[in-house]
Amino acid sequence: MPLYSQIRQSEDAFSEPTYAATNELINDNENACPHCRQERSESWFLKGGRSIVYVSLTFFVVSIGLNFILAILLYSKFHASSFQTEWSAAVADTDCVRRLVAYTPALDSIEYFATNLRDAYRSNDQYLGPPTKEREQMWQDLWLHEAIMVETWAMPLLNRINLDPYEKVEGELGDGYNALLQVHHQLGCLDILRQYTWLLSGKYTTDGIPVPIFLQKPPEENRRHVDQCIEELRMGLMCHGDMTPLLITKKRDGASGFKADMNTHYMCRNFTKLQEWTMSHGVEHWELGDGRGPHEHGRR
């Protein structure tokens, strides 16, 4: 068939061809030239294929970029000190403490340091042994301090809305309520347990070291007080749940069958700094046995 199947002879020979006529002409041309249809099909495929390739490459590059950013964010989260100066890392530690502890006015005094436990707190047995005047005083120096103040605005941070049961700070020292730090209460409880064991052993006498003020009660009341201290220490230990590994040595102990390395590596709080803060922020001195001291359990 000829390339053009007909030559217009009518008066509209030079008028614009209709869509049908144009389509017929294209079909006639492709019928006359079969490879034209194939070229048109291949051209469309190549153009469409390039688009798919471009989209795939773009998606791949974006995915790699997002994964890279995510990796940096995760690394910076778990290795923050790698991206911080020493000063900014210290600030981050303070922020961490604020998130992990209940409110305390002594927050800014909390400072951590890495140490082996016994290397930092070994006392050369100064706190051990039967009661002496010096030993009793050393124990009291650990825990018997003035009350500190929790300001009124901060009481809801301790989940306390009804403030009627709590003792207000007297005078012009501030608008707040008397409190003591839990560590001092726990050390006081430990001291009472120590004293109770020596009391049962007959080591406190009227002509030597007198019976501690908190244990000058009938035996059943003393026992009840000691039980309360045991319960306080149990709850405190369970609440804080120290998960520091206690390594087992190759040595064997006759009683338990194993011997642990008690000089455990710890992140400890600077106890000296806590003591200094407490002594500099005292608002009321409690005399032993005045009915309001740190170990009058259940009294307000």
UniProtKB/Swiss-Prot annotation:
Belongs to the ustYa family. One of its GO terms (cellular component) is membrane. Glycans are attached at residue 270. Its EC number is 2.3.1.-. Transacylase; part of the gene cluster that mediates the biosynthesis of the mycotoxin cyclochlorotine, a hepatotoxic and carcinogenic cyclic chlorinated pentapeptide. Within the pathway, cctO catalyzes the intramolecular O,N-transacylation from isocyclochlorotine to cyclochlorotine. The NRPS cctN initially catalyzes the condensation of L-serine (Ser), Pro, L-2-aminobutyrate (2Abu), Ser, and beta-Phe in this order to produce isocyclotine. The gene is cctO. It is found in: Membrane. GO terms for biological process: mycotoxin biosynthetic process. Disruption phenotype: Leads to the accumulation of isocyclochlorotine. A motif (HXXHC 2) lies at residues 225-229. GO terms for molecular function: transferase activity. It comes from Talaromyces islandicus (Penicillium islandicum). This is Transacylase cctO. Pathway: Mycotoxin biosynthesis. It is a single-pass membrane protein. A motif (HXXHC 1) lies at residues 185-189. It holds the Pfam family UstYa.
